[in-house]
């Protein structure tokens, strides 16, 4: 843990893009070297938290499920108090925390995290959602610290040109990095971890 407390990583993206899969993969990749905890956001359930518990991503006491109600982006941006309270609770429970992963509820391309809540942000999109997603931009996609283009293995089945998808992502993001990934099989996870260690100072 740094003098500023644990690194808080916000993970956002539309429903079904692979946020929970990324969270699970990051837990598995980081937990042997760092003290890790997770906060998940769901609108009316704690389904994502329960999934991570069943998957044994982390010990149960290191996972917090937040039920946001209403619009999920409000709880990570306009009024992040419910998530900030969960961060404070985890820090009180685990004095040695290095990393807190904060997974947002599924939202649209405009969703972003309050800088008060997240030090670094990852935005996940789904190749199967269509060729034009990067061209639609939106703050979450264009301004997150890292974009993860997930489910690239499905591209041949959904008529998506990966080279064009990469080109459009580069145009939308400028110099900001992105990773082509297939998180279910683990492809791209090492690149994401390397980014977090480098940019997050782990």
Swiss-Prot record:
Keywords: Chaperone, Cytoplasm, GTP-binding, Nickel insertion, Nucleotide-binding. GO terms for molecular function: GTP binding; GTPase activity; nickel cation binding. InterPro entries: CobW/HypB/UreG_nucleotide-bd (IPR003495), P-loop_NTPase (IPR027417), UreG (IPR004400). One of its GO terms (biological process) is urea catabolic process. Its main location: cytoplasm. It comes from the Bacteria. Facilitates the functional incorporation of the urease nickel metallocenter. This process requires GTP hydrolysis, probably effectuated by UreG. PANTHER family: UREASE ACCESSORY PROTEIN G. This is Urease accessory protein UreG. The lineage of its organism: Bacteria, Pseudomonadati, Pseudomonadota, Alphaproteobacteria, Rhodobacterales.
């Amino acid at each position: 843990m740094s003098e500023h407390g644990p690194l808080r990583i916000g993970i956002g993206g539309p429903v079904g893009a692979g946020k929970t899969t990324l969270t699970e993969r990051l837990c598995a990749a980081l937990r042997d070297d760092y003290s890790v905890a997770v906060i998940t956001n769901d609108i009316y359930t704690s389904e994502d938290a329960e999934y991570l518990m069943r998957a044994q991503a982390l010990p149960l006491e290191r996972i917090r499920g937040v039920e946001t109600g209403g619009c999920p982006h409000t709880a990570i941006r306009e009024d992040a108090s419910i998530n900030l309270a969960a961060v404070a609770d985890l820090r009180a429970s685990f004095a040695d925390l290095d990393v807190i992963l904060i997974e947002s509820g599924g939202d649209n391309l405009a969703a972003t995290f309050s800088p008060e809540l997240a030090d670094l942000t990852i935005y996940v999109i789904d190749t199967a959602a269509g060729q034009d997603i990067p061209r639609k931009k939106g703050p979450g996609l264009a301004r997150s610290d890292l974009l993860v283009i997930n489910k690239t293995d499905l591209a041949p089945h959904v008529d998506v040109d990966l080279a064009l998808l990469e080109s459009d992502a580069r145009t939308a993001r400028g110099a900001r990095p992105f990773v082509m990934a297939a998180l279910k099989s683990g492809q791209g996870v090492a690149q994401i971890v390397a980014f977090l260690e480098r940019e997050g100072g782990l």
